[in-house]
Amino acid sequence: MQTGTALFIIDMQNDFILSGRPLCVDGAMQTVPQIKKLLDYARSNDWTVIHVIREHDKNGINADKPRRYLFENGMNGYCVAGTEGAQIIEELHPLDNEIIIKKTRNSAFFRTNLDSVLRCLKIKNVVISGTQYPNCIRGTAVDAMSYDYDVIVVTDCCSAKTPEIANANIIDMKNMGIKCITLEELQNS
């Protein structure tokens, strides 16, 4: 791929990756080595790297409605700004020149400046990795397509609760016209 490409690494934060967390995604930790390879590839090809993260107020007021219960009755919530749980996992830590987009909903585009950032940088191609398929991966991929970006989801660099959920989402996204390929296929294209 040429310049004008951005790699999104979505929600690779402690509260989604580490075992025992309320919203830990089964299989997410297993994708870390593959995402690291993709990240190294993106960096070596001078792609724009964008780390997309969830970040919520400690009272959960800006969390999506179905998950606000995680902030109630003495529960500590998830991805609370400034906490260890909201931090990007160490293996994928951003470099100083990489962009961090903070979101409060599934899509990285919803109520963020992501589209403006991409247009300012003359990005045409969006490569998506991270967790998890039915929520943030799919929401971001569909919105990127709706904004007329060429979208690639790197299938072995994304995760879901089960392989069946991942496969169902891959089929749906392919049917929408979103390119879904492996890291090896991306590197050989």
Language model regions located:
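Short glycine-enriched, charge-decorated loop/helix-capping segments at active-site entrances
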Residues: 21-28
